[in-house]
């Protein structure tokens, strides 16, 4: 198994905002993607982000984590895109395909046999609220490595059982704190929170953290349909 090679030109946007002095704006507004924030930095498109990334992005830099005493059990609100799908964990398969040498389809039993990663992080919603949550699952990069991505891969697309879709840059998908989670606060993930498996990461806003993920497709290009909310005007990168 070979480690995923993350291209240097994929930008973690938060560091560009920090050095440019714009990060405080997002904090004052409760999250990126709000209208005023978009009017200020929304034009800083992905091509510009990628050009400056080589100077700024450390793909291994970790976001803050918290002690168990900081967990806020009731603070994570449940937002639904359309409906809550009912998925049988016994028959569920997570597919990873696209520009890979070894397309795979994994059961939850197979996923749960992989090393468990756990983190207590801040989940931040574009609506302006946040929650300290413990997530448990498998590092996404470990799953992607099983599919043997080709050297051309730059993006990961996520398809969910409810029809929701989104895409991430490969650097963020391969970040050590990006999980495919099947536990929340030490308990099996509930259906409302995305069971049997969902994205969880402290480096992206909440709408990037797809629930009920059924398929991950790796590509070399960012496709016209970038994400459900992004296609309606939300920021694509949505980094923290």
Predicted regions and their residues:
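Structured, non-membrane catalytic/scaffold regions adjacent to prosthetic-group chemistry
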Residues: 35-240
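Generic hydrophobic/packing signal
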Residues: 20, 25-26, 124, 225
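Low-complexity, intrinsically disordered/propeptide-like segments
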Residues: 13-14, 19-20, 30-32, 47, ...
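N-terminal secretory signal peptides
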Residues: 1-11, 15, 22-30
């Amino acid at each position: 198994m070979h480690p995923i090679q993350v291209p240097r030109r994929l930008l973690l946007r938060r560091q560009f905002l920090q050095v440019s002095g714009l990060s405080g704006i997002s904090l004052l507004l409760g999250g990126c993607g709000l209208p005023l924030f978009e009017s200020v930095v929304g034009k800083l498109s992905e091509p510009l982000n990628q050009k400056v990334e080589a100077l700024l992005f450390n793909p291994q830099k970790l976001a803050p984590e918290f002690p168990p005493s900081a967990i806020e059990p009731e603070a994570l609100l449940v937002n639904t895109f359309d409906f809550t799908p009912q998925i049988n964990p016994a028959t569920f398969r997570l597919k990873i395909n696209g520009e890979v040498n070894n397309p795979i389809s994994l059961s939850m039993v197979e996923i749960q046999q992989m090393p468990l990663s756990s983190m207590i992080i801040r989940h931040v919603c574009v609506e302006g609220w946040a929650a300290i949550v413990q997530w448990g699952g498998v590092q996404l990069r470990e799953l992607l490595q099983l599919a043997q991505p080709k050297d051309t891969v730059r993006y990961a697309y996520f398809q969910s059982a409810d029809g929701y879709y989104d895409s991430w840059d490969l650097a963020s998908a391969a970040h050590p704190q990006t999980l495919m989670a099947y536990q929340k606060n030490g308990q099996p993930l509930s259906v409302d929170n995305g069971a049997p498996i969902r994205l969880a990461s402290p480096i992206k806003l909440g709408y990037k953290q797809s629930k009920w993920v059924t398929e991950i497709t790796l590509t070399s290009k960012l496709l016209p349909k970038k994400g459900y909310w992004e296609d309606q005007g939300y920021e694509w990168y949505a980094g923290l």
